[in-house]
Amino acid sequence: MNRHPASTLAEGRHRYTLRVYYEDTDAGGVVYHASYLRYAERARTEALRDLGIPHAALTAQYGLMFVVRRIKVDYLRPARLDESLTIVTEPLVVGGASLVLRQEVQGSAGACAVLEVQLACVQPGGDKPARLPPSYRATLAKMRDARVGCDAIVRHDAGVRRDTGIGAAP
């Protein structure tokens, strides 16, 4: 698996750690509000990759992709230049054509922001929802139910399948 070194998956939660760079901040050294959206996007991408269901495989094998349908952000406290942040991602709802994730950006003094993101599955260029492949839905549901880790997945990205009982073959 091509896992990011700052990425872990355990007990139904994915953790992705990054550092705040100057480019992420305003003139006062505080993380600019839109930077949290980028952080969450990176963390979601790495979570899917660590589950063995990366964006590229969903498109290549099924002709589908995720788009953000709705996002809600609660900003709780500022993060600052050079601070180490961990983004914790966990699925709340796994539907037939969408999923809802909770993402918490954690800093040295606690939670900085909490995001609730609804992703819709669509065909590229399409504006109508498409059903998630059953094995993807099953993998995400197992994560939601806190029963999946990096070693208990169905690989979709490299043509390798480890039979774990988490869904059908791709």
PLM features per residue range, with description:
Residues 2-8, 13-16, 49, 75, ...:
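HotDog/MaoC-like acyl-thioester-processing domains
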Residues 2-50:
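Catalytic strand-loop segment that frames the active site of acyl-thioester-processing enzymes
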Residues 29, 89, 127:
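Hydrophobic pocket/interface hotspot
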Residues 50-57:
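Short, surface-exposed acidic-centric catalytic microdomains
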Residues 36-39, 67, 118, 139:
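Residue-level recognition of specific faces of alpha-helices
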Residues 60-91:
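Helix-adjacent hinge/juxtasegments
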